[in-house]
Amino acid sequence: MTMTTLTRRQVLQHAGVLMTGVAVGTGAAAAGRATPASQAGTLVIGKDLTVNRLGFGAMRLVGPDIWGEPLDREAAKAVLRRAVELGVNFIDTADAYGPATDEVLIAEALYPYPKGLVIATKGGIVRPSRERWDRDGRPEHLRAACEASLKRLRLERIDLYQLHAIDPNVPLEDSLGEIAKLQREGKIRHVGVSNFNADELARARKVVDVVSVQNRYNVSDRSSDAVLAVCERDGLVFIPWSPLSQSPRDSNAGARTALEAWAKARGVSFPQAAIAWLLARSPAMLPIPGTSSVAHLEENVAAAAVRITDAEMRAIG
C-alpha cells in the first residue's frame, strides 16, 4: 500500500476484489489461479491440506446472539458463495452456531463443494437456550455431535474437527480419545482444539495428533502467545478468533491505538489493518474474519493485500 490515503474502492481494486463474480467451483478459486484471498499466501494444515491464509468464520451468518435462523437466509448464503469466489478455501463453523443452523447453511450454499475447499467445524458445546454455551465433552456426546455435523454438512469426512472447549467435568483424555477413535474410523481427517492454553495443548497432543489451535487473539489481546509459540515451533496452525474485539482483560490497548493510527495513515479500515497485523504477526496464523455482509466480506478479503513491514510491526508494539 502507498503512503497516501486511499478510498475504499481503491483498496478493493488493489486487492482485486472488485471483479466479476464466478460460479462456485468453476472459477479462479477452484482452478488454483490467483485470487484476492490468495494474496495472503498459503499454509498447510496437517501436512496435506493447503489453504489460502485468509479464511472465513461463518459464525455471524445465523441469527442475533448466534441463535436461530439468519434474518435473511438467501443473503447469508450469498456471503458464503462470494467468499469462495474471492478465493477463500477455508471455512470455519461449529455445531453450536444456531445451533446447527450454520452447518446447514454452508451445505445449502456450497454443496457440491468446490475442489480444494476445506471445512472445519467444532463440537463440545451445547446451546440449551440463547444465553447458554454449556460444555459437553462426554465421549458419547462428541460422537453424536460429529456424526450429526457430517450429515448437516453432507460430508463423508470432516477435514478439521475441533474440540470447541474443555469440559471441566470430563477428563480431557476421554474427550480427545473419542475424537481420535472417530479419526481412525475415517470420519475426521484432522483434529484441532479451541480455547486451550499451552499446558492443555501439551496434554492433548499426548492423546491425538493435534494440527491446529483456535484461540482468541488480536492486537490488544495476546494472552495466547505461549500457544502461538508452540504452533510456530511444531508446525501447527493457529486460528485466531475475535480479531477486532476489546475486553477488560486486554493488555495491549496502546498497540491497538497505534494500529488505528497506522490504518488511518495508510487509508485502510481498522478491520483490514487488524487482519493484516495478524498475517504479519506469524506465518502460523490463519485468520478467519466473519461477517453477514458481502460488502464487509470483500473489505476483509482485501486485507490480504495489505502489508505491514517488520519495522512498522515493531513500532505498533
Where are these regions (language model features)?
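Structural motif corresponding to the early beta-alpha repeats
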Residues: P112-G137, H164
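Non-cysteine beta-strand/loop elements that form the S-adenosyl-L-methionine
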Residues: G57, V118-K122, I239-S242
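Conserved beta-strand positions in the central sheet of alpha/beta enzyme cores
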Residues: G55, F90-D92, D159-Q162, G192, ...
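N-terminal binding-site loop/beta-alpha segment at the start of enzyme catalytic domains
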Residues: T2-L117
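A short acidic, helix-capping loop that chelates divalent metal ions and anchors anionic groups
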Residues: V62-I66, V126-R132, R249, H296-E299
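Beta/alpha (TIM)-barrel catalytic core signal, keyed to glycine-rich beta->alpha loops juxtaposed to Asp/Glu
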Residues: A37, I166-G317
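Short, acidic/polar
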Residues: P70-R82, R138-K151
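CE4/NodB-like, metal-dependent polysaccharide N-deacetylase domain
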Residues: H141-Q162, L182-E185
